[in-house]
Amino acid sequence: MARIETRTEPMVLNMGPHHPSMHGVLRLIVTLDGEDVVDCEPVIGYLHRGMEKIAENRTTVMYVPYVSRWDYAAGMFNEAVTVNAPEKLAGVAVPKRASYIRVIMLELNRIANHLLWFGPFLADVGAQTPFFYQFREREMIYDLWEAATGYRMVNNNYFRVGGVAADLPYGWVDKCLEFCDYFLPVVDEYEKLVTNNPIFRRRIEGIGTISREEAINWGLSGPMLRASGVKWDLRKVDHYESYDDFDWDVQWETAGDCLARYTVRMREMRESVKIIKQAIKGLPGGPYENLEAKRLIAGKKSEWDAFDYQYIGKKVSPTFKMPKGEIYARVESGKGELGIYLIGDDNVFPWRWKIRPADFNNLQILPHLLRGMKVADIVVILGSIDVIMGSVDR
């Protein structure tokens, strides 16, 4: 009987590019030896739209509507860093009320970001049901955004240099508190459904491990860094907005595997609810309806007309010029450190606008993590990183 020849040379496999609703248009050229991954080469750039060059040909006021398209799961963070950089460079003060409103919006976006990570990650592992569950909670956040900003997922166009576009509408604070009270038991439900599922644990526990030293050396940030034993959160480190006014904890793990990254994100959603509740309770001037009543009763000399309570703040003019100088501003987005390196030259347009997205840096470690793993682990490890290709490619 003739012996059947078997292939012994490595096989090259193309994965992607996929639809943007999953992990985005990312192509992986994977070299396989049987089921084992020998090498992986990510190919990026399919969603490049020249966002940095567009910024250098727009005023800050004109550019804010564009930025939701970097990371289309975290539009508020993009807007926050877009206005924080010129504010920092020009020394523009932000009223306390506007700062609290910003914090509320950012933490709602963190929850929405983690939910949109949670669903596809579970789908990658093989659990389809939670993928549909998470849209229920995201829809509630969309409704809150729509009431406050006029738009749902992206293009909120709410942040302004010096404040926010408008105050929170009548009844918004109560609706937001209702969502917070509803959401905490839902996170418990997710954990009960998923966390201790034996199939889920076997798929992600001990997979894609990153040591503390590797996480630092690769320049990782966000849950990727904190899951590897580095207690680093820019909300605590940089003291931006009003985060120092609230009592909350940085969530971190030491295992550095996919399970640790999952755990950090699930806990962060609870912390975000804690921050939102405190921000609403301490909102300078109280809910919009109370603030208006206090102003009316006290008249023009009311303290409620003071800078701290102005809901829109000292918004700059459309011809606002960025002074000469350079600055690096950063915020802790749902994926990690989102930064802007800005050079101003006393012009309405920035001379240089460099975007430092978190997921672009976090994605660099993917080939290192995949070598020696099985084919089935590729989507699990990629899913645990949490990438949005609009942000990676810019």
Swiss-Prot record:
Its EC number is 7.1.1.-. Keywords: Membrane, NAD, NADP, Plastoquinone, Quinone, Thylakoid, Translocase, Transport. GO terms for molecular function: NAD binding; oxidoreductase activity, acting on NAD(P)H, quinone or similar compound as acceptor; quinone binding. Pfam families: Complex1_49kDa. It is a peripheral membrane protein. SUPFAM superfamilies: HydB/Nqo4-like (SSF56762). It catalyses: a plastoquinone + NADH + (n+1) H(+)(in) = a plastoquinol + NAD(+) + n H(+)(out); a plastoquinone + NADPH + (n+1) H(+)(in) = a plastoquinol + NADP(+) + n H(+)(out). It is found in: Cellular thylakoid membrane. InterPro entries: NADH_Q_OxRdtase_suD, NADH_UbQ_OxRdtase_49kDa_CS, NDH1_su_D/H, NiFe-Hase_large. One of its GO terms (cellular component) is plasma membrane-derived thylakoid membrane. It comes from the Bacteria. It is an enzyme of class 7 (translocase). GO terms for biological process: photosynthesis, light reaction. Its main location: membrane. Gene3D superfamilies: Cytochrome-c3 Hydrogenase, chain B. PANTHER family: NADH DEHYDROGENASE [UBIQUINONE] IRON-SULFUR PROTEIN 2, MITOCHONDRIAL (PTHR11993:SF10), NADH-UBIQUINONE OXIDOREDUCTASE 49 KDA SUBUNIT (PTHR11993). NDH-1 can be composed of about 15 different subunits; different subcomplexes with different compositions have been identified which probably have different functions. Belongs to the complex I 49 kDa subunit family. HAMAP family: NDH1_NuoD. NDH-1 shuttles electrons from an unknown electron donor, via FMN and iron-sulfur (Fe-S) centers, to quinones in the respiratory and/or the photosynthetic chain. The immediate electron acceptor for the enzyme in this species is believed to be plastoquinone. Couples the redox reaction to proton translocation, and thus conserves the redox energy in a proton gradient. Cyanobacterial NDH-1 also plays a role in inorganic carbon-concentration. This is NAD(P)H-quinone oxidoreductase subunit H. It comes from Trichormus variabilis (strain ATCC 29413 / PCC 7937). The lineage of its organism: Bacteria, Bacillati, Cyanobacteriota, Cyanophyceae, Nostocales.
